Swiss-Prot record:
Organism expressing this protein natively: Kluyveromyces lactis (strain ATCC 8585 / CBS 2359 / DSM 70799 / NBRC 1267 / NRRL Y-1140 / WM37)
Protein name: Pre-mRNA-splicing factor CWC2
Record's function text: Involved in the first step of pre-mRNA splicing. Required for cell growth and cell cycle control. Plays a role in the levels of the U1, U4, U5 and U6 snRNAs and the maintenance of the U4/U6 snRNA complex. May provide the link between the 'nineteen complex' NTC spliceosome protein complex and the spliceosome through the U6 snRNA. Associates predominantly with U6 snRNAs in assembled active spliceosomes. Binds directly to the internal stem-loop (ISL) domain of the U6 snRNA and to the pre-mRNA intron near the 5' splice site during the activation and catalytic phases of the spliceosome cycle.
Transmembrane feature ranges: none
Any single Gene Ontology cellular-component annotation: U2-type catalytic step 1 spliceosome
Length: 337
């Protein structure tokens, strides 16, 4: 994902009038407002292909969240259904290393969308995730339904998963397990795995060049969950070390870029000061150049003014006649006693 999104405002993905109802399709007799699901009906949830999807290249852009210094991403943007566009107060772009560093410095108890994590994973490995056990690996199931039963070779399926998921962040590895008909996708950064889990849920693996593309909504969509932790202690230790290194690397890059921005601002200010001083000196020089009276004539006039002033001062001085001298004290003699 390139940085072109920084030069344009985020676009509206969906008009507000076209937003779907928050109530899911009826599958039971009673609707539970607390869990947002139907009860007393069919067990299990019916999967489908969502009609909304994220187009990172065209949907990404600047929002109010960028201007306000927000660090969390828009959940509806990830699902391809944000109706606010540039007026959204959350971020509208694919998470980058600088975003990961800001999230890591802020809190590890919140995901990239600002939702609170839990101490443990859910039994079905869905949901927001755990703050005790960071996870960069996603389990991807429902591949057959996401392909509308299209027959592909194992390496073709793996490449298609890599193509679809690679748009949402830098991948560390992708492994397709043919016997289980599922895939495991590992990202470089955890924020990308959190973002992708929401963005790729109930999405299709078909591409526009497939002849089944027009019928993609008849499939069942992908099932994206958190992968279970590796039971090997050595692997868990290595994974923790890798995550720590990635976090430190991202924080160092963020600090370096911040310092570079500050230094660049200082250089710009210094250049502006030099330009202002040069402009002032040029202005003073132009005044001298374009003077009405020549400098030599001005000097002669100054000298003449000084001469005239001295003459006037001398003329104003008057000499008074000396007065008769009077004795200061009458002479005193002791003979008068």
């Amino acid at each position: 994902m390139t940085g072109d999104w920084k030069n344009r405002p985020a676009r509206v993905q969906l008009q507000e009038s076209d937003l779907p109802s928050s109530v899911p399709p009826q599958t039971g007799l009673a609707f539970n407002v607390w869990y947002n699901k139907w009860s007393q009906g069919q067990s299990g949830s019916t999967r489908f292909v969502t009609p909304y999807s994220l187009d990172p290249e065209n949907d990404s852009g600047i929002t109010k969240g960028d201007k306000e210094g927000r660090i969390h991403f828009c959940l509806y943007f990830a699902k391809g259904m944000c109706c606010l566009g540039k007026n959204c107060r959350y971020l509208h772009h694919i998470p980058e290393p600088d975003d990961f560093a800001r999230l890591a410095l802020h809190s590890s108890a919140l995901d990239c969308f600002g939702r609170e994590k839990f101490a443990d994973y859910r039994d079905d490995m869905g949901g927001v995730g755990s703050f005790k056990k960071p996870n960069r690996v996603l389990y991807v199931g429902g591949i057959t339904g996401a392909l509308n039963n299209k027959t592909l070779k194992p390496h073709q399926i793996e490449n298609r998963v890599k193509y679809k998921f690679g748009k949402l962040g830098e991948l560390d590895s992708v492994r397709y397990v043919e016997s289980k008909n599922c895939a495991f996708v590992k990202f470089k950064l955890q924020c990308n795995s959190e973002f992708t889990k929401e963005a790729m849920g109930n999405q299709t693996l078909l591409i526009p060049t497939d002849k089944e593309w027009d019928l993609r909504k008849e499939g069942t969509g992908l099932l994206v969950k958190w992968a279970n932790e590796d039971p090997n202690p050595a692997v868990r230790k290595r994974e923790l070390e890798e995550q720590t290194q990635e976090t430190l690397k991202a924080i160092k890059q963020l600090v370096a870029s911040t310092e570079g921005t500050v230094n660049q601002k200082r250089k710009v200010e210094e250049i502006n000061e030099v330009r202002d001083s040069q402009a002032n000196s040029r202005e003073r020089f132009s005044i001298r150049e374009n003077a009405i009276i020549d400098k030599t004539i001005l000097d002669k006039l100054k000298q003449r003014k000084v001469t005239i002033t001295n003459t006037n001062v001398a003329a104003n001085i008057t000499v008074s006649k000396p007065s008769s001298v009077l004795p200061l004290v009458t002479q005193y003699s002791s003979d008068e006693d």
